[in-house]
Amino acid sequence: MSQAEFEKAAEEVKNLKTKPADDEMLFIYSHYKQATVGDINTERPGILDLKGKAKWDAWNGLKGTSKEDAMKAYINKVEELKKKYGI
């Protein structure tokens, strides 16, 4: 998997005909962050920020995953979503 394939997938996911389910969006978000930033580097959001906590927890769950593995999983998930939702 190359950086170019990853960047293409990042653009394609924005053009899906239907918004993916929340769990699919968390997968996409967390793997994108792991691939581009690496291990989480922020504090967990406060108790009232439910969406922020869900995103933080999903990204934190990937701690230790290599950028390459996160990139590969991201690309594979986008391909799956393209088949499911169309672009």
UniProtKB/Swiss-Prot annotation:
The modification N6-malonyllysine is found at K55. An acyl-CoA binds at K14, Y29, S30, H31, Y32, K33, K51, K55, Y74. It is found in: Endoplasmic reticulum; Golgi apparatus. The modification N6-acetyllysine is found at K8, K19, K51, K55, K77. Pfam families: ACBP. Gene3D superfamilies: 1.20.80.10. GO terms for cellular component: endoplasmic reticulum; Golgi apparatus. The modification N6-(2-hydroxyisobutyryl)lysine is found at K55. Keywords: Acetylation, Antibiotic, Antimicrobial, Endoplasmic reticulum, Golgi apparatus, Hydroxylation, Lipid-binding, Phosphoprotein, Transport. Residues 2-87 form the ACB domain. Coiled coil: none annotated. The modification N-acetylserine is found at S2. It comes from the Eukaryota. One of its GO terms (molecular function) is fatty-acyl-CoA binding. The modification Phosphotyrosine is found at Y29. The modification N6-succinyllysine is found at K8, K17, K55, K77. GO terms for biological process: defense response to bacterium. Binds medium- and long-chain acyl-CoA esters with very high affinity and may function as an intracellular carrier of acyl-CoA esters. It is also able to displace diazepam from the benzodiazepine (BZD) recognition site located on the GABA type A receptor. It is therefore possible that this protein also acts as a neuropeptide to modulate the action of the GABA receptor. DBI(32-86) has antibacterial properties. Belongs to the ACBP family. Monomer. PANTHER family: ACYL-COA-BINDING PROTEIN, ACYL-COA-BINDING PROTEIN, ACBP. This is Acyl-CoA-binding protein. It comes from Sus scrofa (Pig). The gene is DBI.
